[in-house]
């Protein structure tokens, strides 16, 4: 067709540009860059400014450890989880083709977790049996007294969720840890700089110690404020409340780290835009951003059952404790017992606020703030190839929104707080209606 057109002086028809998927586009770009490299070698041109995508090779484990600042900064929290038997992850030896973080049911950490869990479960069962027995044999069968017992018994049941909600997802948690390790090294190879997490090391140590200090303070406050709360009951609640605090700390640390990584990526991208031939590097930045977005989703996938079940417990406990305190004030006025219940409500709402608020800030920093910096780039000052790469990065952000969710069950953001508060208000009204109905029946009798 082309020969026929040329021989007759006609213009051949234009070709229709094919539609390529992301993998085909990446392959085509790599081929074009490889040809450009061969041409530069043939011309004797310096290759320092040339860019060719690095092939997927097995990274040196010692280099991974060298650039794994996040693991070193948060190691104290990982060790605390191992000591408490919450998440028995292991750090594999530096061997090629072996992930740096792993999970094994036959490891020393897993055996220790089972041993600690057996002791803790024994104490929980003893306290649970004592509380149920005391409630059954108590002459006071009021609805309010049943509510008080439900609060503390429901907290004890969270202990039995640990093997199902936490240990079962150990391999997914190990994948998430390895994603952080690989991401930092990939960031270094792409940008030439490392991700710096300022004050994260100190913050993690403070959160680890504060988790247990807060647990002891809350349980002792219940011992002094609740008349039927014996001192030996607290030994069953210490590790449960501390575990809740540790999971809240883990969520806070990771959300903070996501924001730091996003800020480092945007700074490196802006520095590249101001340099020569930025289009050749922007593709790698796009892949780095997509990896960061997937890592945020992996956090919710790895801990979906644990955080989901604890959110339900927090929601349930907040409603019951709020009703118990309001009901007791209506009947007998303000006493120390109501103060103890308000402490529980305040703790649960603070836990829920931190959980949702930090996820909101992480999603905004990785998504909206990063997108805003891209939109502020003066595209008239760059070449056409760079403009296309910036557009592709904006498309990647819109197609892969950095939304933190619990494996698709629920999106974690500020809207979840308002939804829970509205549900709490609804259920409180229903419970107070039961209260008023019970009072009317007693007055009639």
Model-derived segments and their meaning:
Residues 165, 191, 273, 300-303, ...:
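Long, hydrophobic, amphipathic alpha-helical segments used as structural scaffolds
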Residues 111, 117-156, 181-250, 263-282, ...:
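Helix-loop-helix junctions within predominantly alpha-helical proteins
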Residues 46-75, 152-168, 256-273, 374-375:
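Short, non-transmembrane cytosolic segments of multipass membrane proteins
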Residues 152, 156-159, 179-182, 186, ...:
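Charged, amphipathic alpha-helical oligomerization/scaffolding segments
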Residues 71-177:
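Non-cleavable N-terminal signal-anchor transmembrane helices
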Residues 162-181, 251-264, 349-376:
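Inner-leaflet juxtamembrane helices
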């Amino acid at each position: 067709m082309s020969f026929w057109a040329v021989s007759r002086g006609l213009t051949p028809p234009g070709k229709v540009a094919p539609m390529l998927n992301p993998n085909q586009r990446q392959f085509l770009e790599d081929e074009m860059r490889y040809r450009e490299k061969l041409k530069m070698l043939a011309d004797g041109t310096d290759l320092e400014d040339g860019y060719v995508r690095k092939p997927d090779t097995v990274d040196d484990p010692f280099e991974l450890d060298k650039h794994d600042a996040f693991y070193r900064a948060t190691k104290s929290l990982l060790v605390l989880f191992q000591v408490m038997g919450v998440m028995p992850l292991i750090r594999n030896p530096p061997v090629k083709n072996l992930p740096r973080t792993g999970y094994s049911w036959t490891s020393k950490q897993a055996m220790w977790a089972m041993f600690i869990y057996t002791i803790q479960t024994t104490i929980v069962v003893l306290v649970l049996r004592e509380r149920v027995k005391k409630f059954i044999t108590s002459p006071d069968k009021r609805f309010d007294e049943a509510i008080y017992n439900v609060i503390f018994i429901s907290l004890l049941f969270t202990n039995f969720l640990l093997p199902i909600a936490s240990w079962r997802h150990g391999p997914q948690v190990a994948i998430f840890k390895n994603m952080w390790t690989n991401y930092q090294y990939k960031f270094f190879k792409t940008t030439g700089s490392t991700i710096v997490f300022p004050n994260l090391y100190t913050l993690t140590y403070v959160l680890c110690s504060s988790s247990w200090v807060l647990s002891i303070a809350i349980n002792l406050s219940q011992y002094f404020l609740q008349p039927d709360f014996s001192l030996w009951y607290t030994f069953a609640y210490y590790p449960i409340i501390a575990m809740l605090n540790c999971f809240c700390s883990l969520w806070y640390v990771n959300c903070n780290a996501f924001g730091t990584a996003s800020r480092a990526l945007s700074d490196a991208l802006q520095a590249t835009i101001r340099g020569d031939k930025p289009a050749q590097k922007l593709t790698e930045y796009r892949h780095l951003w997509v990896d960061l977005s997937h890592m945020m989703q992996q956090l919710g996938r790895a801990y979906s059952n644990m955080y989901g079940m604890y959110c339900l417990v927090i929601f349930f406990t907040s409603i019951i404790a709020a009703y118990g305190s309001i009901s007791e004030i209506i009947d007998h006025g303000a006493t120390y017992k109501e103060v103890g219940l308000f402490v529980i409500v305040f703790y649960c709402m603070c836990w829920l606020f931190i959980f949702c608020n930090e996820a909101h800030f992480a999603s905004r920093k990785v998504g909206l703030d990063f997108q805003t910096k891209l939109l502020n780039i003066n595209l008239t000052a760059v070449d056409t190839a760079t403009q296309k790469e910036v557009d592709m990065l904006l498309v990647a952000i819109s197609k892969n929104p950095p939304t933190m969710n619990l494996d698709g069950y629920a999106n974690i953001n500020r809207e979840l707080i308002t939804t829970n508060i509205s549900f709490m208000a609804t259920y409180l009204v229903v419970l107070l209606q039961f209260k008023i109905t019970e009072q009317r029946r007693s007055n009639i009798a």
